[in-house]
Structure formats: C-alpha cells, structure tokens
Amino acid sequence: RGLGDVYKRQGKDGKLMTSKAKWWTSGFFPGVLWYLYEVNQDDSLKMYAENYTKRIENEKYTTDNHDVGFMLYCSFGNGLRLTSNDEYKQVLLQGAESLSTRFRPQVGCIRSWDWNQKVWEYPVIIDNMMNLEMLMWASKNSDNPKFAEIAKSHADVTMKHHFRPDYSSYHVISYDTISGPVSYTHLRAHETLMNL
C-alpha cells in the first residue's frame, strides 16, 4: 500500500479496505495496534503501530472537520502513553490547536462539518464528544486552560441539547449562530436513521 493508506474496515467480501489518512476512522487501526502491543509487548506489533501512526501525522493540521481529535488521540495518544515518544506529544498538541479552531464561543461547541451549509448552519454531531479527551489531555500537558475550557463547554452544551427525555441522542444538532445565545428554539434536529 502507499504510505498514506490506512485500514478503515472490512468490506462485504471480507477483504480489508483502505483509505487515505484524512478518512475519519484512520486513527482507529493504529490505535488497535497500540493496544495489541500493550498486551503482549511484541516488537513487530510496535513496529506496525509506529508505521500506521506515522501515516496520519499530517492530520495534526486538519481544521476542516472535527475528526482530528479521535484520529490522533486513538493513534498518537496510545503511542505516547506506551512509548513516551516526545514527537507524539507534539503531534497531539498541534492537533488540539487545530481542533480548537472549530470552536465558536457563541455556540459553545466544536463545529463538526463545513459541508451541506444549506441544511445545517453550525452542525454538531454526537461523535464530537470523542474529541474531548484529547483536549483535556492537551490542556494538562501544555498548561493552556483554553483546551479544557473548550472541552467543558462542548460537553455542557451537548448534554443540554443532544439528548431526548428517554436519553437517546440526536446524531446532528444544527445551532443558530446569528440570533444570539443558543436556545431550544434555535435548534434543528436532523432526524435520520443515524439518530442513536
């Protein structure tokens, strides 16, 4: 495979499918390799984990979607935890900086996507919660409270708006960014089969 290819999932025919590093699940496969290495300390697994982790390093500069948090924290986060490689720390700190550019204080959340703006003004999906661990880590490891403040704000707003009375969640909430503070009257729930 090319250097930028990562495994994304198993296809219907049972064969592994690959994707480019920008694909939203690109950090999961290297993250799993790090977990396998943690369990059995097999150096060949460590080598594969390092290789597949390196393939997504440029995503630390991603600012056009929210996926950067879980792409990097699953891979580089586990790599750092198991090896103390300072290069991994720098990747994570840059990734947190990139992710934080998607936060809008007026909304209190990290914007998920930039596409389909005719439907969603400021879409936030429930998956975005997976990014908060990296932001909390970055705040602690950089002494920059900004990252923790973003994570806490995002969690608070998500808890307030994303969940129904029966505790199921909407997949997408679109927030109004123009008419002032967000309230329930400014929310549009994207009703699809993707709702949890």
Language-model segments: what does each one mean?
Residues L36-E50, L80-L93, S139-K152:
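Structural helix-adjacent loops and short alpha-helical linkers that scaffold large soluble proteins
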Residues G2-Q10, T185-T192:
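Conserved small/polar residues in nucleotide/adenosyl-binding loops
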Residues D5-S26, L36, Y48, I56-Y61:
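Internal amphipathic alpha-helical repeat/solenoid segments
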Residues C109-Y170:
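Aromatic- and glycine-enriched pocket-lining scaffold segments that form the walls
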Residues R1, K46-T63, V91-R111, A151-S168, ...:
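Long, well-ordered core segments of solenoidal/helical folds
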Residues K22-Y37, D64-R81, Y122-K140, R188:
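Well-ordered alpha-helical segments within folded domains of soluble proteins
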Residues K8-G14, T53, S112-K118, S174:
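Short linear capping/connector segments at secondary-structure termini
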